[in-house]
Amino acid sequence: MALNLTRLLLSVLVFGASLGIFIPASFSEEEEKVLDVQVYLTKKQAFEIAFPGADKVDREKKWLTKEQKKAIGDLCLQNIKTNRVTFYVGKRDGVPMGYAIIDHEIGKSFPITFMVVLNVDGSVRDVEILVYREPRGWEVRYPSFMDQFTGKNADTDYRIINSITGATLSVRAMVKGVSRATAAYKVLYLSGKP
């Protein structure tokens, strides 16, 4: 039965192509470009940037309660679906230097993997793209865009972040990701509740 269905679909595709309809050229071009995944940083390289001089990086997995998910969502204006958040804590002589979260957010069609580095007070110190999978919008990795996040925190109105022509969806993805990271940090580390 599966073979008959495959033959039927192939026949429809061939017939549609012979009429000059049904198969847009941009689809195949888009698919070819998607295979060009850009890995900018490994996790190890990202931690070296996030925590220069650290003698240790600890991983802290935080399981979220319903109340924490709601609080994070209220701060970043998003529906939080995940049940766990993982923070990485860079330490020197046992003292936290800062925190980082590695997360993913969908650009146009594919996830952008990024790291948000936070100071102990919850303000953004750095944002780095680790892996970019979209054919367009890669300009979000440039310092001229990323530096806009420096100093922002969970109370920031992220609508002040300037967009990039031709990279609107990637910009939105990064804004969502950074605002979610700062909100999670505020709720989990600064709220005074365990």
Give the positions of each predicted feature.
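Bacterial N-terminal signal peptides that target proteins for export
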Residues: M1-V12
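Bacterial N-terminal signal peptides
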Residues: S11-I21
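Flexible, solvent-exposed loop/hinge segments and secondary-structure transition points
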Residues: S26-I164, T168-R172, K176-P194
